[in-house]
């Protein structure tokens, strides 16, 4: 569902900046030539979602320059939020916190089976992001359901033009 929504919401913005969609079934991957290489953008889902279903999952958007027009290409790169200004990162934090506020209480059965350290780490997923994100923070877009994804895919297309300007400056 993440890739489908990403393709619909972000595809027009990428196309307007000269990116073509990579013909990968059900994957949100775009590329454009950059001299003898390619700039590639893709949506990457976490490999470690919440196994207990409380706080959900997350995704990022990666940008890299490399020899091949495919997701995971080796080369210099950045993640979406590294390319935002302070205002853009604040908008991301606002959505992140809105999603966190909507979380239900953590499941008691899960809390009972975790040791103190694991419980603290688990509960941290339900705490608001109180400090402003910095340009070097590794920010993942959290989601539990379609409503959360809709919130992200309302915001991300608004931020995409500025991000793609930064991609052109930094990666070509």
Label each region the model flagged.
Residues 1-9, 21-172:
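Intrinsically disordered, low-complexity regulatory regions enriched in serine/threonine/proline
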Residues 14:
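Acidic, metal-coordinating catalytic segment for phosphate/diphosphate chemistry
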């Amino acid at each position: 569902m993440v890739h489908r929504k990403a393709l619909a919401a972000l595809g027009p913005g990428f196309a307007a900046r000269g990116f073509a969609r990579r013909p990968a079934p059900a994957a949100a991957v775009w590329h454009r030539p950059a001299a003898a290489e390619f700039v590639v953008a893709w949506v990457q889902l976490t490999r470690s979602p919440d196994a207990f279903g409380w706080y959900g999952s997350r995704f990022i958007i990666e940008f890299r320059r490399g020899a091949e027009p495919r997701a995971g290409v080796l080369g210099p790169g950045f993640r979406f939020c590294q390319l935002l200004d302070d205002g853009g990162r604040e908008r991301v934090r606002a959505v992140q916190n809105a999603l966190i506020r909507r979380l239900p209480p953590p499941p008691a059965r899960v809390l009972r089976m975790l040791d103190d350290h694991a419980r603290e780490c688990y509960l941290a997923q339900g705490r608001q992001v109180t400090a402003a994100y910095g340009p070097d923070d590794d920010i993942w877009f959290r989601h539990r359901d379609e409503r959360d994804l809709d919130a992200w895919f309302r915001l991300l297309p608004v931020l995409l033009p500025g991000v793609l300007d930064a991609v052109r400056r930094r990666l070509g």
